[in-house]
Amino acid sequence: MANDITTTAAWQSLTERYEAFQGTTLRELFQDGGRAEKLSFDAAGLRVDLSKNLLDDAILTDLVALAEQAGLTDRIEAMFRGEHINNTEDRAVLHTALRLPVEESLEVDGQDVAADVHEVLGRMRDFATALRSGAWLGYTGRTIKKVVNIGIGGSDLGPAMATKALRAYATAGITAEFVSNVDPADMVSVLEDLDAESTLFVIASKTFTTQETLANANAAKNWLIEQLGSEEAVSKHFVAVSTNAEKVTAFGINPENMFGFWDWVGGRYSVDSAVGLSLMAVIGPRDFMRFLGGFRAMDEHFRYTDFGQNVPVLMALLSVWYTDFFGAETHAVLPYSEDLSRFAAYLQQLTMESNGKSVRRDGSPVTTGTGEIYWGEPGTNGQHAFFQLIHQGTRLIPADFIGFARPKQDLPAGEKSMHDLLMSNFFAQTKVLAFGKTAEEIAAEGVDDNLINHKVMPGNRPTTTILAEELTPAVLGALIALYEHIVFVQGVIWDINSFDQWGVELGKQQASDLAPAVSGEVEVDSGDSSTDALIRWYRTNR
C-alpha cells in the first residue's frame, strides 16, 4: 500500500489552516504592503505573481512542507535521470531530454538518448531547411507553400497550438493546416483550399496505426493521386513522424523521410519532438531551437530552485490547495493573446489526460481529489461570455491570466493603443476578482437599494498572473514546460501515474468492435439495448 498523503503532518496542518482561514479576505492580506513583492517570481523569462491567491505565510510554509513530505525532490531527480517512473507501462518519462543541449549526454537503459534526440533534430533541421529554401520540390517541380499536419491528440494539439502562437515567425512563405478529426468535414474543409502541387502532408502517428490518422492520411493520399495523376507523387508530398518503417514504406513514403520519436515521450509531451516538424517547417530551425531553449530554461528552474521559490511547484501546490481543501473542480486559463487561442485546448489534454486518475500508482483508490477540469478562452472574449460566473457565481474557479508587455502587431484605439486597451482589461479583471466591491461601496455611489445586492462583487476569487515581455518561441517553450511540470508535481502529491492513459484505450477498442455493425456489415448486437437501438436508428437514417 502506498503512503497516503492525507496522513502526513503537512496535510493535517493544512486541514486546520483551511478552517482557520475561512473568512479571511485578500483585502486583509494586502494590508501587508510587501505581499506582492514576496509572492512574485521570475522563471525562464516569465514574471509570475501569486499574491492574489488565497494563502498566507503559514499556509505557504505548509504547502512547501507537503511537497517535501511527498518526496518531490527524489521524484524530480528520478524523472530527469530516466528512471521508469511510468510504472504501469514500465517506461522512462523523458520529455525533458528532448531539449537537452547538444553537448550533454544522458544514458538510459544503455542508450544515449540525448544523442538520439540530436540525430533526429539534425534530420528535421535539414528537411525544414530544404523545404524553406525551395530545394525540396513537389512532384511537378513546384516549391512547397502549405504543410498539412495529419495527427490526433498530442500529434495535433501541440503543433497546432504552437504554430498559431508563433505565426509572427512564419517568414519563409510556408503556412500550415491541421487535420485531426475523423469527421470527414475536417479533411474536406482543408482539401478544398489546397493546391496539390505545392502541398506537403506530414502524417504523425508513432505506430502508423492510429485509426483516425490513417483514415485521414488515406483520404489525403487518394486526393493527391487524383489531383496529380500518379501514385509516384506520394513520395514527394508525404513525410511521416513515426517509428514503423514497414507501414510507412507500404503507404508510399520514403523511409528516409520518416522522423522518429521514442516510447519515453508521451504524445501530450511531444510538441518539441519530431511531432513539431510542421512547426519547424513554418518558423524555421533557428526559432525552433529557441523554442527548445525556453523549455530547457524552465526545466532548469524546476530542477534546481528551492520549492519556496519554484514557480511550477508553487502553482501545482496551489492547485492541490484549491482542489482538495476548497473543493474547486475547474481551472480557467485565460491568455490575453489571440495568438494563444488554442492554448487552453492544448492544456486540456496535457492536464486532464495526465491527472484524470482515480487510483494511485500501486492501484489502490485515491484518497484525494485529482485532475482539475482545465478550460478557457482568450481575453477579452471570455469577459463577454463566462466571466460573470467567475465573478459572482457560487463556484470557486481559480484562474491563470497570461499577458505580454509587447504585442507582435498593434493598432491605434483613438489616441491610445489597442494592446494597452487589452492589457487594461487584463489588469482590471485580476483586481476585481481579488478585491471585489462591497455593498457599502456600491451604496455610497447612490445605487438603488434593490440593486445593491445584485451589484456586489464578492472578490476573493484567486488568480495567478503570468507576464512576459513578448510571445517569442523561447517564452512559449517556457510556458508549456511550466504546465508540464505543474502536472508532474500534482501527480506526485496525489501519488498517481501522470504518464499513462488507460481511460482512452477501452473506447478505441469498443469503436473498432462496433464498426461492422455501424457500417451495416453485420447485425447489431452490442450487448446492451440502448446502444443497439441507437445504432439501428443511425442505420435507418443513414
UniProtKB/Swiss-Prot annotation:
Keywords: Cytoplasm, Gluconeogenesis, Glycolysis, Isomerase. Pathway: Carbohydrate biosynthesis; gluconeogenesis; Carbohydrate degradation; glycolysis; D-glyceraldehyde 3-phosphate and glycerone phosphate from D-glucose: step 2/4. Belongs to the GPI family. Its EC number is 5.3.1.9. Catalyzes the reversible isomerization of glucose-6-phosphate to fructose-6-phosphate. This is Glucose-6-phosphate isomerase. It is found in: Cytoplasm. It comes from the Bacteria. The lineage of its organism: Bacteria, Bacillati, Actinomycetota, Actinomycetes, Mycobacteriales. The active site is at residues 353, 384, 508. GO terms for biological process: gluconeogenesis; glucose 6-phosphate metabolic process; glycolytic process. GO terms for molecular function: carbohydrate derivative binding; glucose-6-phosphate isomerase activity; monosaccharide binding. It holds the Pfam family PGI. One of its GO terms (cellular component) is cytosol. It catalyses: alpha-D-glucose 6-phosphate = beta-D-fructose 6-phosphate.
